[in-house]
Curated annotation (Swiss-Prot):
CDD domains: TrwB_TraG_TraD_VirD4 (cd01127)
Subcellular localization(s) per the UniProt record: Cell membrane
Lineage: Bacteria, Pseudomonadati, Pseudomonadota, Alphaproteobacteria, Hyphomicrobiales
Record protein name field: Protein VirD4
Gene: virD4
The keyword Cell membrane is assigned to this record: yes
Domain of life from the UniProt record: Bacteria
GO cellular component: plasma membrane
Pfam families: T4SS-DNA_transf
Family recorded in the similarity comment: Belongs to the VirD4/TraG family.
Family annotation (SUPFAM superfamilies): P-loop containing nucleoside triphosphate hydrolases
Key words of the record: Cell membrane, Conjugation, Crown gall tumor, Membrane, Plasmid, Transmembrane, Transmembrane helix
InterPro entries assigned: P-loop_NTPase, T4SS-coupling_protein, TraG/VirD4
Bilayer disposition of the protein: Multi-pass membrane protein
Organism per entry: Rhizobium rhizogenes
Transmembrane segment boundaries: 12-32, 60-80, 153-173
Length: 671
């Protein structure tokens, strides 16, 4: 089989033929320039133009210049005709071809490192060379399909986080994105947040999805609460589909009631419905208590149902996502908000949603709710003049989040609101398992940049091969006659074949990737690895300082226990330093009732970490006083007890400050 593409040999032959045709046309002009007569026809020669050239007669004549113009014009016409005929023959079965780097640079998809503003998908050369990087150009959304250990993290996700000039909300399944890129994001001016509700050390920032609804006017709260319920509560199995609407109505009524009570959190909704007793009695009581008409209506309807039906509603509500808030960690992480969604387009922000692979399925309702709520808020209004940053949703392990109906709809519209999606999955079958065929095609048709790394499933290679298309080639067949030894027949025909067959996709080497860009030919590129790329490695190694870890989150029971321990330590330290009873020190002219009331108020302040600022006591003075009373100093106690005693001395300073606050100033020392 011989390909019909234009080769240098064929191009040279075409030029020779076109020049020959032009020379003949010039000879005709030289012969018949005075008219078509019999004498001219008798003397015609194909070399007539040669006799008019300076090489033959020694000087240029007007006939020579006219003939030269005829040669050039004829050659161009012949070459264009041959090219058109060749292209028509080749387009008969397909025109698929690989894109050239030059045309991709001209289209704006290949950029030098210092001009990259969007995601990074690949590179035109090896890691040690100054090549161009592939970005998304005018395409807002992208899809990365790569199996495990194929390099999507080191080649796409981390380079994107290191270079993207805008706000990023990244699903960090392993927690490594925060460790590897958070310092770079912070040094570039980002406000960095780590939302990790199930972190073993409770180091997480907080986000309360109900606060946005509580801040809305009352007439809009019901609609937004219904949207929140649809995003959070999903049916688990076909048996739950008949009760999902009632379960969502219950959730809506619970949110409205908690907002009315001044506890706008999903944890408060869980506690509200987790109360013991008959559910119909609870709903009847809530209907009487609530002033919100929609909440009253829902609770009234629920109170009139049979106990079994109510049990089904509450069961579907819990299994659909609300039971996640039985975990104290989740309750605490959603009790307040440390960042505002309304600021994401106004100032650069990076939010890492950190969760371990084992907890991803468990915490998926919360992550799903956060993503969909941010999308909903972004689409409430067009970006203002001060909202100049784009928001990139980096969805790694997209499949495990479940069905995201809000994102499925928003992918067609959110680009106008400065929103971008990057979906990362292991194979196209992951979309088939979560979305129906229409939803899957919606994602594929709206992701303008699709990056594929070597995959072994059946669906993905077939999709890539069909998406790239076929090219036309010339097939040559030879047949021989049995009667005569040297008698044979040769037939040449145009046929089509895939530019890249499915089996070739499976054999793609570990350093290459295939990129499909809407409106452009397919592109084959080198993968990027940030740790070996000369530019990205420099950016990664420039990170300095500690990780921007949030403070350890305090749970509700911890606050109560810390308050009790705080007061116990005060009493213990007072006795150890020989200060006697606090009541006898503080009670100076006050009645016991007044003194106890004041001390109780002060103890409440101590329990929540608020201390009296009126008097400051230096620790050195406290130690001197302790030494005067015969108490062993810190230096004389065992080393393992020194930190504890130092903390107790600080508590003592606070106690003395309280004592001086509640007694008149006297020059006599306390005995």
């Amino acid at each position: 089989m011989n390909s019909s593409k234009i080769t240098p040999q064929r191009l040279a032959l075409s030029i020779v033929c076109s020049l020959a045709a032009g020379f003949c046309a010039a000879s005709l002009y030289a012969t018949f320039r005075h008219g078509f007569n019999g004498e001219a026809m008798m003397t015609f020669s194909v070399f007539a133009f040669w006799y008019e050239t300076p090489l033959y007669i020694g000087h240029a004549t007007p006939v020579f210049f006219c003939g030269l113009s005829i040669i050039i014009a004829t050659s161009v016409v012949v070459l264009l005709s041959q090219l058109i005929i060749s292209l028509r023959n080749r387009e008969h079965h397909g025109t698929a071809r690989w894109a050239a780097f030059g045309e991709m640079r001209h289209a704006g998809y290949l950029q030098r490192y210092n001009r990259i503003k969007g995601p990074v998908f690949g590179k035109t050369c090896g890691p040690l060379w100054f090549g161009n990087y592939l970005t998304n150009g005018e395409q807002p959304h992208s899809l990365v399909v790569a199996p495990t250990r194929a390099g999507k993290g080191v080649g796409v996700v981390i380079p994107t986080l290191l270079t993207f000039k805008g706000t990023v909300i990244a699903l960090d399944v392993k927690g490594e994105l925060f460790e590897l890129t958070s310092r770079a994001r912070k040094s570039s001016g980002d406000a960095v947040f780590k939302f990790s509700p199930l972190d073993p050390e409770r180091r997480t920032h907080c986000y309360n999805p109900v606060l946005d609804i509580a801040a809305l006017p009352p007439e809009r709260q019901f609609t937004e609460t219904r949207r929140l319920a649809a995003n959070l509560i999903t049916a688990k199995g076909k048996g739950a589909e008949g009760f999902i609407d009632g379960a969502r109505d219950l959730f809506v009524a619970g949110i409205l009631t908690c907002i009315e009570r001044g506890t706008p959190t999903i944890g408060a909704v869980y506690d509200l419905f987790a109360q013991p007793g008959e559910k119909y009695k609870l709903f009847a009581h809530l209907a009487e208590e609530s002033r919100n008409k929609e909440a009253q209506r829902i609770f009234d309807n629920m109170a009139g149902n049979d106990t079994k039906i109510l049990t089904s509603y509450t069961s579907v509500l819990g299994d659909g996502g609300l039971n996640l808030w039985a975990d104290p960690l989740v309750k605490a992480a959603t009790s307040r908000s440390d960042f505002s969604v309304y600021d994401l387009r106004r100032k650069r922000t990076c939010v890492y949603l950190c969760v371990s692979p084992n907890d991803l399925e468990v915490v998926a309702p919360l992550m799903r709710l956060l993503f969909q709520q941010v999308v909903s808020i972004l689409q409430r209004s067009l970006p203002g003049k001060d909202e100049r940053y784009e928001v990139l949703f980096l969805l790694d392990e997209f499949k495990h989040l479940g069905k995201l109906e809000a994102i499925e709809t928003a992918i067609t519209t959110i680009a106008g609101y400065k929103g971008r999606f990057m979906f990362i999955i292991q194979s196209l079958s992951a979309l088939s398992g979560t979305y129906d065929e229409a939803g899957k095609q919606n994602f594929l048709s709206n992701t303008g940049v699709q990056v594929f790394m070597a995959t072994a499933d059946d669906e993905t290679p077939t999709y890539i091969s069909k998406a790239i298309g076929e090219y036309t080639f010339q097939a040559r067949s030879t047949s021989y006659s049995q009667a005569r030894m040297f008698d044979h027949n040769i037939q040449i025909s145009d046929q089509g074949a895939p530019l890249l067959r499915p089996e070739q996709v499976r054999l793609l080497d570990d350093k290459s990737e295939i990129v499909l860009i809407k409106g452009q030919p397919p592109l084959k590129l080198r993968k990027v690895r940030y740790y070996s790329d000369r530019m990205l490695r420099r950016l990664f190694e420039c990170q300095i300082g500690a990780l921007p870890e949030p403070a350890s989150l305090m749970l509700a029971q911890d606050v109560h226990q810390d308050g009790q321990d705080h007061l116990s330590q005060q009493a213990a330290v007072t006795a150890a330093l020989g200060l006697g009873d606090i009541d006898s020190l503080v009670n100076n002219g006050e009645t016991p009732t007044q003194q106890n009331s004041d001390m109780n108020d002060e103890q409440d302040n101590l329990a929540i970490g608020i201390y009296a600022p009126q008097v400051s006591v230096e620790i050195d003075d406290v130690v001197e006083d302790a030494n005067a009373r015969g108490v062993a100093p810190v230096s004389s106690v065992p080393a393992e007890m020194a930190p504890a005693l130092s903390a107790q001395q600080q508590l003592l300073g606070q106690i003395i400050a309280l004592q001086q606050r509640y007694r008149p100033v006297s020059s006599n020392p306390i005995e």
